[in-house]
Amino acid sequence: MSKQTASNRGIIMIPYAYLVNSNTGVNIANRSKQVDIYMKNCCVACLSAKKYNDSDTDVALVTNIDPPKEYRDILESHKIKIIHADFDLFNFSGEYTWALAFYKLCALHHVLHEYDYDYYAYLDSDVFIQSSFNNIWTECDAHILLYDINHGLQVKHYQHILSEMRDFMPSLFSNGNLPTHYGGEFFAANRANTLIFI
């Protein structure tokens, strides 16, 4: 597929994937309404991003499904892009905890390689954007921005990650520093750094 030239300088993506029998958020008690619950969240995230950002920033729902008509109509009426991207990368077994969360990386890969933006960002679907991304884009000129989940040493999961990293790369720990544990809830970077990241 040839790359599409983007008319705007940045894109804010809300990725959403659905695969039957794959694990997703632990807060979804009613699996039969999973798509509906997530689509409502996606609409709130996309609409708030659109409201607070200027016309130089595109907002997109990136998904592997055809959104139900009621949500598609809402998004399209607010000039929010709907980008279809198959879940063909970073796809682990459906039993894997948070298996669908890795779709964010897949969506980022597809949009990066199919659209030519200066800046790329993705966020979880359960967010409300409260201001413009212009300052984020400026910071992306020098940095990759990620969300620090603030796991302390009291968190067993973090202890296991540190143990594995220490075994793999002892020099990383030689000065007593502990690496920051980043979550996948937020990512933003310029094009060059996104290419390195992905």
Predicted regions and their residues:
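Conserved glycosyltransferase catalytic-site signature
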Residues: 39-43, 101-105, 184
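GT-A fold catalytic core of metal-dependent nucleotide-sugar glycosyltransferases
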Residues: 104-156
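N-terminal anchoring/stem segment of glycosyltransferases
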Residues: 2-92, 115-116
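Short, solvent-exposed loop/turn segments at secondary-structure junctions
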Residues: 19-23, 65-68, 88-90, 127-129, ...
